[in-house]
From Swiss-Prot:
Family: Belongs to the MurB family.
InterPro entries for this protein: FAD-bd_PCMH, FAD-bd_PCMH-like_sf, FAD-bd_PCMH_sub1, FAD-bd_PCMH_sub2, MurB, MurB_C, MurB_C_sf, Oxid_FAD_bind_N
Keywords for this protein: Cell cycle, Cell division, Cell shape, Cell wall biogenesis/degradation, Cytoplasm, FAD, Flavoprotein, NADP, Oxidoreductase, Peptidoglycan synthesis
Primary localization: cytoplasm
Enzyme Commission code: 1.3.1.98
Stated name of the protein: UDP-N-acetylenolpyruvoylglucosamine reductase
GO biological process, any: peptidoglycan biosynthetic process
One Gene Ontology molecular-function label: FAD binding
PANTHER family (alphabetical): UDP-N-ACETYLENOLPYRUVOYLGLUCOSAMINE REDUCTASE
Summary of the function given for this chain in its UniProt record: Cell wall formation.
The UniProt record lists the keyword Flavoprotein: yes
Organism, as annotated: Rhodopseudomonas palustris (strain ATCC BAA-98 / CGA009)
Pathway terms, separated by semicolons: Cell wall biogenesis; peptidoglycan biosynthesis
């Protein structure tokens, strides 16, 4: 499936644009599941100024979606209408220490942020070492692990709205809840300041090793997977509910519930986005029938089915 090419009109309306505009660009290689259709337009801004130039000149009727690292994401097989924005490490990937704070661009890898903090003997950010995403995604979904989450360490975050206005949001304004931020979905986050706590190198390294060991032992990190599929219901573990419903190893097409960890769906090699999403909905239905609990997706699903763009 392909979309009408609108990049010539966009380029004509934005003569000073420095970033890349690509038409009908495949998104599957940019997601951890390696599935899905193309973006009608993929825009990679050169830097914050370039993003601020682009947004107000984009026609209001064209939808915009910021992709992040593509770890907790399913792009449907029909692709993504409108503009997908991908922030590059070159323009948005910095991570540096300022006193007891870490300034991190939205494209900075969570793991690298943890390492940068550790090198400055700042603790409290070790949980990021085990999260396969970027800081932008962490802001959007209040990413967390090992009993800690982004709301515990965020000082403030910078974002751009559709008018190209740069805005600053403190922790309270992010309206964090479990694996969710209540901030306007149209905002594109570009950086964050995170609070660290002075700690000894041995203490920090021990916590990071603990995080890594847990991932190695309990999660299918060498598979094509999007990470945790469903949110844990209050007081319960999603994987236990999935296992109790008999879904461990369940397959639909090329998608499978991981044998190692039931809250992970994997692409065994030939899965489509529809296979993965259908498998997830099947798991939800079986869990609801077995336990009465309605699991909520943690993985974000975007785009359209084939023929519906």
């Amino acid at each position: 499936m392909s979309f009408p090419d609108i990049t010539p009109e966009l380029k004509a309306a934005m003569p000073e644009l420095r970033g890349r505009l690509l038409s009908n660009e495949p998104l599957a290689p940019l997601t951890w599941f390696r599935v899905g259709g193309p973006a009608q337009v993929l825009f990679t801004p050169a830097d914050e100024d370039d993003l601020g130039y682009f947004l107000p000149r984009l026609p209001a009727e064209i939808p915009v979606m910021c992709l992040g690292l593509g770890s907790n994401l399913i792009v449907r097989d029909g692709g993504l209408p409108g503009v997908a924005i991908r922030l590059s490490p070159r323009g948005f990937g910095e991570h540096r220490v300022e006193g007891e704070m870490v300034h991190a661009g939205a494209a900075a890898l969570d793991k690298r942020v943890a390492e940068t903090a550790a090198a400055a003997q700042l603790g409290g950010l070790e949980f990021y070492y085990g999260i396969p995403g970027s800081i932008g995604g962490a802001l959007r979904m209040n990413a967390g692990a090992n009993g800690r989450e982004t709301k515990d360490v965020l000082i403030d975050a910078t974002a751009y709205d559709r008018s190209g206005t740069r805005k600053l949001f403190d922790n309270a304004a992010m309206q964090f809840s479990y694996r969710h931020s209540g901030a306007d979905p149209a905002l594109i986050f570009t950086s964050a300041r995170l609070r660290g706590t002075p700690a000894t190198p041995d203490h920090i390294r021990a916590k990071m090793n603990e995080v890594q060991a847990h991932r190695e032992l309990a999660q299918p990190i060498r598979e094509k997977t999007g990470g945790s599929t469903f949110k844990n219901p209050p007081g319960q573990s999603a994987w236990r509910l999935i296992d109790a419903a008999g879904c461990r190893g369940l397959k639909i097409g090329g998608a499978q519930v991981s044998e190692m960890h039931c809250n992970f769906l994997i692409n065994t090699g030939e899965a489509t986005a529809a296979d993965i999403e259908t498998l997830g909905e099947t798991v939800r239905a079986r869990v609801k029938a077995q336990s009465g609990v309605e699991l909520q997706w943690e993985i974000k699903r975007i785009g359209v089915a084939p023929g519906k763009g």
